[in-house]
């Protein structure tokens, strides 16, 4: 597990589960809790099974909080791998000039299986 800086947490924005992840956890509270625990790790700066250089890139994004991308990789209890990707980390709609960007351009987080990328 790759650890990171302990930043002041920012919002992960809107959470979206891919169709496959949503189906995987549907009607299975153990799987749902496992995935949600990984989202909390991601939110707290634990990047999971990332290479050290990728973890450092995430740490730099957290320190700057200016709209970068965070990527985490985790193994679930049944050994399936999920990715959690936050785009626009640290941005809020108040930071955006909505004449140039839409609200979808500020922070959002997607939980997906690698094969869905």
What are these regions (language model features)?
Residues 1-3, 92-93:
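Low-complexity, charged, repeat-rich alpha-helical/coil interaction segments
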Residues 66-117:
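Short, compact, well-ordered microdomains
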Residues 2-71:
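Compact soluble domain cores
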